[in-house]
Structure formats: structure tokens, C-alpha cells
Amino acid sequence: MARKKKRRQQPGQRILVAALAVALLAGAFGLGWHFGVESTRFRGNILLVNESHRLEADYVPDELVNLYQQRHSFRLASSEIMLTRQTYEAMERMFHAAEEADMNGYIVTSGYRSYQRQQEVYAQSEPGKAQQPGASEHQTGMAFDVTVETGDGFENTPQYSWLMAHAHEYGFIQRYPANKADITGISYEPWHYRYVGVDAATRMHQTGQVLEEFLGGNG
């Protein structure tokens, strides 16, 4: 009996099959699939989020805690502000140390922000004043905004100077410094701090790097 000849796949068919397989795997493992936008970048457990490395709409960090329900050495602008537990605990240690150094009056104004909430913020903001949904660090639950009651601007206060000198000791970095806007893509934000852990924060403090540089790329 004559054997059936196997139909050979053409090169184009093999490429298409491979591409479909990669897409299916990306979906199955939650890797994200954005055209023109890379998946978020990690170094160890440090997460990079910016316009080029976005979070999925359904990303919610583990162990979010409501700061109003926790003991805290700082004031809150709202009773609904949340952060990851690890970030909150490091922040509480930091502001407790500030309090002992007679640096009082810190007011935390923002923390975790969902993808959907960021959509609202983006829609209500002037162009260039807010990150697009998925590109905001607030969605990680590891970033917060802080200020004090002053008419001079937070960056002109002793509380700001104390943070700049000591934040890294508790694992925090000022995420968007004035001299790195060309790398971060974000204008100077003296009020915005991000938890990355003591080792990474200390190294960035010593070298003057921002997160994009520390993780090995500018976006």
C-alpha cells in the first residue's frame, strides 16, 4: 500500500506557528502583550514601571494595607490611602526616625492607585501632568507622594532635606529628580518616593542613578 507523503511546512508557516505559540504562552503566564510597549522590567524583585514598561490593567499588588488603620508617625490627606505592607512598614520606620530628629509635619497625600483610578486621573489632568494608565508607579503600591504644610514648596523645607539625606537608609529613592528628566521621562517631582529596598536605594544614592539606569536601560 502506498504511503502518504508528509506535507512539508513552508518557512512562513513555521514562523507564524512560532509566533502564535509565543503569544499563547505570554497570555498563559501573564507576561503581557503590548504592541510598542515592553513588559515591565525586573532586577531581582525590583519592578520598573514607566511609559515603556507598563503594568496590566488587572495588576494588583499583594498585601495592600490601609494606612489609616495602621499606627503611623505621619499625617494622611485621606483615610483611603493604601500601600503594600512592606512599603508601609519601611515608611513608618523612616517617618518615626524623622520625628525623633524633630522633623515633623509630613503629610502622605497619595499611595496605591488602581489602573482604573489612573484612567480617571489621566483624563482629568492637563497634558503631561499625569502618567498614562499602566505607566504609573502608584499602581505598584510601592510609591507614595508626601508634602508638608508650607507655601514655599516641599523642596524648600527642612523635611525635604532630611528625606534626601536619609530616605535610602529605609529603602526609598526620590524617583524623579530634577537632573534626570531626560531619562525618566518625568519632570521633577520632589514629593514622589519609591520603595526599592535598602541595598538598591543605598547604591542609587551613592551613584546618583535613577531606576532606569540602575536596571540597565533608559526605558
Question: What function would you assign to each model-found segment?
Answer:
Residues A2-G111, Y115-G219:
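Extracytoplasmic cell-surface/polysaccharide-interacting catalytic and binding patches
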